[in-house]
Amino acid sequence: MIISIVSGKGGVGKTTITANLGLALADIGKDVLIVDVDIEMPNLSLILGMKEVEGRAYATLHDVLRGEAELEDAIVGREMGKSQVLVLPASLALEKLKHVREDRLKEVFLAIPDFAEFVLVDSAPGLGKSALAAICYSNQIILVATPEIAAISDNLRTMEVARRVNAGIKGFVLNRYQRETAIVNAEEMETLFNASCLGVIFEDKRIGACTASGRPFILEYPSIEASLTLRKIAAMLAGMSSEEERESEKASALGRLLSLFRR
């Protein structure tokens, strides 16, 4: 199952949501691969605290697209909290942009389902080649939206393109929401996008601080509303019943409590 996290506009928290949603799925026992296909401005490795990406011996997505590495050589296991995820990072080095063949992204999308039950793709913003590949070759897409004029306008275009190519639109996440300043609420955005709101994540300085320091907020602050919202979305994507979701939440809470005593 490939689920691409998309947005018509940059800076809306798409990468942060992709990383933390991937960890939420891993936390309920799912095999997860998180992929960065933002070719020009990749940030996923930074959000996940992978400071060793550029100095490591293994490859990145850019090397695969340049024909210099096999896909399996670019996928790395990452211990995050009490779970493990697979990550296919993109390179942060400018020189790796040379000779990248984005047409090879189709081959990547056809191959990545073999590596995990759930593949979460951090798409590039907008409607460039890599963003269109994420929309066209995924089983489902989740839009990340913020309640701002520019973001809404760009996301309306993204949704229009997604519908034209018959993409499986799962819904949208309303991110960085503030009741006092938002020009629209979740219900109004459902009408605008003709799609379901999967969850609302309120503006929270702790999230920004975690993102800036490369620490997933779902691990640092597992009980804040944003973390609980992503866990509910993960349970929904996994097809868990309400009872299974409650049991998973209990197990996660117990695991977090036990980890405190091990410190």
Placement of each model-derived feature along the sequence:
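Conserved beta-strand scaffold positions in the cores of enzyme catalytic domains, especially
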Residues: 2, 85-87, 197-200
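Short, conserved glycine- and acidic-residue-centered signature motifs
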Residues: 18, 57, 101, 105, ...
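P-loop/Walker-type NTP enzyme "switch/lid" segment
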Residues: 37-114, 211-213, 219
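Conserved catalytic-core segment of NTP-binding enzymes
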Residues: 103-107, 111-114, 118-209
